[in-house]
């Protein structure tokens, strides 16, 4: 099994000037080719500021880096993988920076939480969505679920009530926890504040659970949008294995 970290762009948060990487993840295990999250919608490539405004993101921040290399197809290409190779597509949650290109992998089995999939469309942003649920074969998750041995989807409600994180065990590197937005950055744990969460109390419980799991398993805890960690991580075409 091996893991690659994908670069889906850079976003600036107006409130604090924080510049956050937009990650995706690709995992190979045996004959399975697993993509986790898909970044922003392709419309952002032509007009990032205009689409930010029309999607209601304009009051929150702006996409400051989004090139034709910062999408799933291009990032997978760095690894010698084509979109048609993807067997499984995991959606951690339905926000705008995670769900934008889920329609580009029609052959893949989609893994999404039951709570998230029960929404008429992905939550996207501010209750408006330019994304529909794809017609993929879909597995809905409401409890810890192994995709394959060594890759477990873990419900982590709070940021959204259908949020999923992943726990995987790499043969040499060891255990990795992909928290996604269940823990965006370590400040959330240090301050014990989850102000952007759909349910802050549930978010707190999920974050504490993941932290305890990381301590217990001596795991690498990968945050969803930590500027410092983002600068230090190896990204595609490099691997963790």
Q: At which residue positions do the language-model features occur?
A:
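Zn-dependent metallo-beta-lactamase
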Residues: 1-65, 209, 216, 228, ...
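Short hydrophobic/aromatic-enriched beta-strand-loop microsegments
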Residues: 109-114, 178-180
């Amino acid at each position: 099994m091996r893991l690659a970290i994908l670069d889906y762009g850079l976003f600036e948060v107006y409130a604090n000037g924080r510049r956050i990487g937009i990650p995706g993840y690709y995992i190979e295990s045996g004959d399975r080719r697993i993509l986790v999250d898909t970044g922003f919608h392709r419309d952002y490539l032509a007009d990032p500021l205009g689409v930010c405004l029309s999607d209601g993101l304009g009051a929150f921040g702006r996409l400051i880096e989004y090139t034709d290399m910062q999408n799933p197809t291009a990032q997978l290409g760095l690894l010698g993988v084509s979109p048609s190779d993807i067997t499984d597509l995991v959606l951690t949650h339905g926000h705008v920076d995670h769900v934008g290109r889920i329609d580009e992998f029609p052959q893949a089995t989609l893994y999404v939480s039951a709570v998230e999939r029960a929404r008429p469309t992905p939550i996207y942003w501010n209750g408006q969505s330019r994304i529909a649920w794809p017609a993929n074969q879909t597995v809905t998750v409401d409890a810890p679920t192994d995709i394959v041995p060594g890759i477990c989807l873990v419900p982590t409600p709070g940021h959204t009530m259908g949020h999923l994180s992943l726990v995987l065990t790499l043969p040499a590197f060891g255990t990795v926890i992909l928290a996604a937005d269940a823990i965006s950055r370590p400040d959330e744990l240090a301050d014990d504040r989850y102000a952007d969460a759909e349910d802050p109390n549930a978010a707190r419980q999920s974050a504490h659970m993941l932290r305890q799991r990381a301590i217990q398993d001596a795991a690498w805890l990968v945050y969803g949008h930590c500027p410092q960690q983002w600068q230090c991580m190896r990204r595609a075409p490099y691997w963790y294995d």
